[in-house]
Each structure stands twice: as structure tokens, then as C-alpha cells.
Amino acid sequence: MRLRKKWWARPELEASPIFKSLDEARELKGNWKDEFKNNNDIYLELGCGRGGFAVQAASKFNDKNLISIDLKDEVLVYALKNIVDAELENVRLVAMNIGMIAEIFDENEISRIYINFCNPWPKDRHNKRRLTHTRFLTEYKKFIKPGTEIHFKTDDLDLFNDSLVYFEESGFELLYKTYDLHNSDYADENLMTEYETKFKEKGIKSKFLIAKLK
């Protein structure tokens, strides 16, 4: 569903120190720890939507920093509100196309990546747009630390199975996988996204994996 343009969203985002434009994020490349004013590990969420997962993750891992990315101001403005309401200081939001992600991070700057329910791009000619495709994994390897884990969730079976191949081809070790996350031994650790809650209510199984950079 196409989002209705909210002309007030960008000014509201820019008024908050939590939000960074693409230009500001580029200037922070290699210096994100200065932005957070600590040396804690930095986790990255690719596609944060309205921020439900970000709030949970930043609260649970309050000794880590989290950078959450999304393209649309119209969703980021709601993520900002949720983060502010939760009084979290260890989160930053960036508005950008994830295809440019290597422009804002330096080598060894990220310690974990979350990819939750991204666009499955089912047509063969669009597969390279998948956030787990080898093309993207190659970009992530430019700025993640050795041993970094990528946590990936999807409701799409074809995307999940293809992603298993992408990770293997890109030099990642598969640590965990399940085709039914909510009935798995990882269920208690799982942090639910907005989409995931809706899928669960409809009986749609979530697939989940953890892959580690060797």
C-alpha cells in the first residue's frame, strides 16, 4: 500500500537529535561511537518501519547502540515517536536507500544486523534487490566485524530458502534456522515486529535464521 505523503514528517524528524539525514550519516562514517558518546557495540536494523522492533531491541540490549534505517519519512516519524516515548537514548534513525548503506559505515563499525520481513522481490529479474542477496551481503561485509551475526526473519518461503544459499555463497556460517519461529526453541528470545504479529494472528509461519560472518 502506497503511503500518503506527510509534508510535516521531515521537519519533525529533523528537529530531533535521534534522526540523521543521509548527508549527516555520511559525515558520521567511522565516527558513530562519537555520536553515541560511548564505545558500545553498534547493531543495525535494515527496514525499521514504525519502530516497534527498534524499541524492543534497544530496551533489551541497553548496553548496545542501535541504528535503524528506513527509506520513508512517513514511517520514520512514527518510529521516532515510539523511541521518544520509550525514553531511549541508544537509538538513531536514518532515512536512506539501503542500497547505499556502505556509504555511512566504516570497516568493523557494525556488530550485528537485523533484517525483518523485507520485500521478497519474487520475480527473478528483481532478486538482486533482496536485502539478503549476495550483492547486499558483499556490501555489508565492508563494514561488519568478523563474527558478526545477521538475524533474518521472513514469512516468504522462497526468499528464506534462497537466502540460505546467499549466505553460504557469501562466506557466512549458518548458526540457526527454523521454518516455524514461534514454535521453535528460539521463540522466547524473539522480538516481534508489527508485521510478524499480524502474520502470527493469521496463522502464517515466520522463518528465521542466524548467520555469522566467518
Curated annotation (Swiss-Prot):
<keyword id="KW-0949">S-adenosyl-L-methionine</keyword>
<feature type="region of interest" description="Interaction with RNA">
    <location>
        <begin position="125"/>
        <end position="130"/>
    </location>
</feature>
<comment type="function">
    <text>Catalyzes the formation of N(7)-methylguanine at position 46 (m7G46) in tRNA.</text>
</comment>
<feature type="binding site">
    <location>
        <begin position="193"/>
        <end position="196"/>
    </location>
    <ligand>
        <name>substrate</name>
    </ligand>
</feature>
<dbReference type="Pfam" id="PF02390">
    <property type="entry name" value="Methyltransf_4"/>
</dbReference>
<keyword id="KW-0819">tRNA processing</keyword>
<keyword id="KW-0808">Transferase</keyword>
<feature type="binding site">
    <location>
        <position position="123"/>
    </location>
    <ligand>
        <name>substrate</name>
    </ligand>
</feature>
<feature type="binding site">
    <location>
        <position position="97"/>
    </location>
    <ligand>
        <name>S-adenosyl-L-methionine</name>
    </ligand>
</feature>
<feature type="binding site">
    <location>
        <position position="70"/>
    </location>
    <ligand>
        <name>S-adenosyl-L-methionine</name>
    </ligand>
</feature>
<feature type="binding site">
    <location>
        <position position="45"/>
    </location>
    <ligand>
        <name>S-adenosyl-L-methionine</name>
    </ligand>
</feature>
<feature type="binding site">
    <location>
        <position position="119"/>
    </location>
    <ligand>
        <name>S-adenosyl-L-methionine</name>
    </ligand>
</feature>
<keyword id="KW-0489">Methyltransferase</keyword>
<comment type="similarity">
    <text>Belongs to the class I-like SAM-binding methyltransferase superfamily. TrmB family.</text>
</comment>
<dbReference type="GO" id="GO:0043527">
    <property type="term" value="C:tRNA methyltransferase complex"/>
</dbReference>
<dbReference type="InterPro" id="IPR029063">
    <property type="entry name" value="SAM-dependent_MTases_sf"/>
</dbReference>
<dbReference type="InterPro" id="IPR003358">
    <property type="entry name" value="tRNA_(Gua-N-7)_MeTrfase_Trmb"/>
</dbReference>
<feature type="binding site">
    <location>
        <position position="155"/>
    </location>
    <ligand>
        <name>substrate</name>
    </ligand>
</feature>
<dbReference type="GO" id="GO:0008176">
    <property type="term" value="F:tRNA (guanine(46)-N7)-methyltransferase activity"/>
</dbReference>
<comment type="pathway">
    <text>tRNA modification; N(7)-methylguanine-tRNA biosynthesis.</text>
</comment>
<dbReference type="InterPro" id="IPR055361">
    <property type="entry name" value="tRNA_methyltr_TrmB_bact"/>
</dbReference>
<protein>
    <recommendedName>
        <fullName>tRNA (guanine-N(7)-)-methyltransferase</fullName>
        <ecNumber>2.1.1.33</ecNumber>
    </recommendedName>
</protein>
